[in-house]
């Protein structure tokens, strides 16, 4: 089992990567095994980059509509959230937050 979650594959960049890999597979330019290696490296790179390079902070408020805990993964559905950055506020109708336990014991600091 992979030590990295596949969450970022559902982001816009992850979907674009998956579509491009599917095209390459259907054209016979790469094998499905190579595509899986690329996706694994994508999962690893996204996880490491977000853990090591992103240092921005924000606060948010909203109405908790739904929450679930299944297989060590929390999912929260927040309605009417308001995000406050340093000098900007952004709102939305609904967001989903997915929080996963780290699989790397050295990351528990």
Swiss-Prot record:
Entry keyword annotation includes Signal: no
Main location: nucleus
One Gene Ontology term, aspect cellular component: transcription factor TFIIA complex
Residue runs in coiled coils: none
InterPro entries xref list: TFIIA_a-hlx (IPR009083), TFIIA_b-brl (IPR009088), TFIIA_gsu (IPR003194), TFIIA_gsu_C (IPR015871), TFIIA_gsu_N (IPR015872)
Keyword set, alphabetical order: Cytoplasm, Nucleus, Transcription, Transcription regulation
Keyword check for Transcription regulation: yes
CDD domains: TFIIA_gamma_C, TFIIA_gamma_N
GO molecular function, one term: RNA polymerase II general transcription initiation factor activity
Cellular compartment(s): Nucleus; Cytoplasm
Gene Ontology terms describing biological process: RNA polymerase II preinitiation complex assembly
Pfam families: TFIIA_gamma_C, TFIIA_gamma_N
PANTHER family reported for this sequence: TRANSCRIPTION INITIATION FACTOR IIA SUBUNIT 2
Protein role: TFIIA is a component of the transcription machinery of RNA polymerase II and plays an important role in transcriptional activation. TFIIA in a complex with tbp mediates transcriptional activity.
Family recorded in the similarity comment: Belongs to the TFIIA subunit 2 family.
Oligomer status and interactors: TFIIA is a heterodimer composed of the large toa1 and the small toa2 subunits.
Protein name: Transcription initiation factor IIA subunit 2
Record organism: Schizosaccharomyces pombe (strain 972 / ATCC 24843) (Fission yeast)
This protein's encoding gene: toa2
């Amino acid at each position: 089992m992979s030590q990295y979650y596949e969450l970022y594959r559902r982001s816009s960049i992850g979907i674009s990567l998956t579509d491009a890999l599917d095209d390459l597979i259907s054209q016979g330019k790469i094998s499905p095994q190579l595509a899986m290696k690329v996706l694994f490296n994508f999962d690893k790179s996204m996880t490491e980059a977000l853990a090591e390079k992103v240092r921005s902070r924000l606060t948010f408020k909203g109405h908790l509509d739904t929450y679930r805990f299944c297989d060590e993964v929390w999912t929260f559905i927040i309605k009417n959230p308001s995000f406050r950055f340093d000098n900007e506020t952004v709102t939305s109708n609904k967001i989903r937050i997915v929080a996963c336990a780290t699989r790397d014991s050295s990351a528990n600091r």
